[in-house]
Design a protein with these regions (language model features):
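Extracellular receptor-binding modules and their adjoining Ser/Thr/Gly/Asp/Asn-rich linkers
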Residues: 1-119
């Protein structure tokens, strides 16, 4: 974790731009191209921890300002650590397996993480 802060279980993470190649961080960029996966547990700053890069989860933290329906592609959101319904031009890294339509960043949904792809 190279974010300078803790990463929470369910946070969406990206590759950190460092030469070591083994660092992750959080982003506030919608549809970030360096999206990598989701933290499987809380990870303290400057520590290592498990990251889910593909497969099923019940832990993905999401924002529902743009309604999420089952089957929607998900990408990074403008609030660090959260995913959102991906838009055209975004990098998607997950498929929603649960709807979330509340206009907040309190959602935790089932999702299938996939190899990132530009939509």
């Amino acid at each position: 974790n190279n974010s300078g802060a803790g990463i929470l279980q369910g946070d969406t993470v990206i590759f950190a731009a460092v030469a070591a190649g083994d660092n992750i961080t959080l982003t506030t960029t919608q549809g970030h191209d360096l999206v990598f996966g989701m933290a499987l547990e809380n990870i303290s700053s400057a520590q290592y921890g498990p990251i889910l890069v593909e497969g099923y989860t019940k832990l993905l933290r999401v924002n529902g300002v743009t309604d999420i329906a089952i089957g929607d592609l998900l990408g990074t959101y403008t609030v660090a650590g959260f995913a959102m319904k991906a838009a055209a031009g975004d990098m998607a890294f997950a498929i929603a397996l649960e709807a979330y339509t509340t206009d907040d960043s309190l959602g935790v949904i089932d999702a299938l993480l996939i190899s990132p792809r530009l939509i």
